């Protein structure tokens, strides 16, 4: 897994070699750091999760409908400093894929992406806790109703297969199938300004060798307001508001209860500065106040969660 992780990282960095003005290769590379301060579910002296990630895409001008996409990610849990994880777990993710999109009419664009996501979780002793391979099929479309209004939908179907877990966990098969939906609109009301609103839903159906239903579902409305405040600066306000049943999981593993619920809404703001059309800096902060968790035993706990992000977008 580490060899694959390193190889994908080298491929991402190697894409910069094509950043010549006359090259037929175009794309972007986006390094990102995120601090998830969940206070470790309320425990004292807990440290945040540090997320480091590189995402990007690569296109060849002779084949404009095809795009290679990738993500390389590392999560360090319960660690005081970046790359200093001595007590917590570390998760690695490699997420390559290929996307085909085509403009069918002047207003309608159709697309299909195929992605293969590998994840590995290690403890502080570098012992493997689990590996999971996820196959993903992602159809999407966008439709320009007017020059200002666009409708869009993306549906992701996935299958997760777990490997290399402890004998106790391996005795209970926990592969899963699921889907994720984004569907909404974008309205551009001024140059460089837009309002976006998406309905988002994720559903997972866990598989067991000898157990019954085990499902989870999460539903949100996700609005974003983007305001260009100057030639080089943009401010974006966004939210993630739970609707319907919110975030719920049913688990039939012999616990006291079979239902887990979590209520949380996120409020965030991003500050975007364009040094040039090809070099962009983005920093942001978000909070989920008064998160309410109802566990399987019926006990209710409340937390305040915070997220701090920074990323660089380099286009070539």
Regions found by a protein language model. Name each.
Residues 38-42, 77-81, 119-125, 160-166, ...:
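Outer-membrane beta-barrel proteins
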Residues 1-30, 63-67:
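Cleavable N-terminal export/targeting peptides
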Residues 29-37, 68-74, 112-118, 153-159, ...:
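Transmembrane beta-barrel strands of outer-membrane/channel proteins
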Residues 285, 302-316:
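Outer-membrane beta-barrel "beta-signal"
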Residues 25-27, 62-68, 105-112, 147-153, ...:
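Repeated loop/turn-to-beta-strand initiation elements of outer-membrane beta-barrel proteins
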Residues 54-60, 96-102, 139-143, 181-187, ...:
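Residues on the lipid-exposed face of transmembrane beta-strands in outer-membrane beta-barrel proteins
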Residues 142-254:
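Detector for outer-membrane/organellar transmembrane beta-barrel domains
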């Amino acid at each position: 897994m580490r060899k694959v992780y390193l190889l994908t990282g080298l491929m991402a960095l190697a894409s910069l070699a094509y950043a010549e003005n006359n090259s037929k290769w175009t794309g972007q590379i986006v390094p990102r750091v995120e601090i998830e301060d969940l206070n470790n579910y309320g425990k004292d002296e807990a440290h945040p999760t540090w997320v480091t990630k590189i995402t990007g895409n690569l296109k060849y001008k002779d084949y404009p409908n095809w795009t290679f996409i990738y993500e390389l990610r590392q999560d360090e849990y319960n660690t005081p400093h970046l790359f200093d994880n001595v007590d917590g777990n570390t998760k690695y993710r490699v997420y390559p894929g290929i996307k085909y999109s085509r403009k069918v009419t002047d207003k309608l664009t159709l697309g299909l992406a195929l992605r293969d996501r590998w994840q590995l979780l290690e403890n502080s002793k570098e012992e493997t806790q689990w590996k999971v391979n996820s196959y993903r099929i992602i159809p999407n479309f966008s439709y320009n109703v007017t020059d200002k209004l666009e409708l869009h939908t993306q549906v992701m179907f996935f299958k997760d297969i777990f490997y290399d877990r402890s004998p106790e966990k391996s005795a209970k098969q926990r592969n899963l199938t699921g889907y994720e939906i984004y569907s909404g609109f974008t309205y551009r009301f001024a140059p460089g300004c837009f309002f976006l609103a998406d309905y988002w839903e994720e559903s997972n159906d866990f598989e067991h060798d000898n157990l019954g239903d085990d499902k989870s579902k999460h539903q949100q409305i996700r609005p974003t307001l983007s305001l260009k405040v100057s030639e080089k600066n943009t401010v974006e306000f966004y939210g993630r508001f739970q609707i319907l049943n919110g975030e719920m999981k049913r688990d039939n593993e012999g616990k006291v209860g079979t239902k887990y619920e979590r209520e949380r809404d996120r409020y965030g703001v991003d500050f975007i500065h364009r040094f040039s059309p090809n070099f962009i800096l983005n920093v942001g902060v978000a909070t989920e106040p008064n998160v309410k968790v109802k566990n399987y035993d019926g006990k209710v706990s409340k937390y305040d969660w915070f997220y701090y992000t920074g990323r660089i977008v380099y286009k070539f």
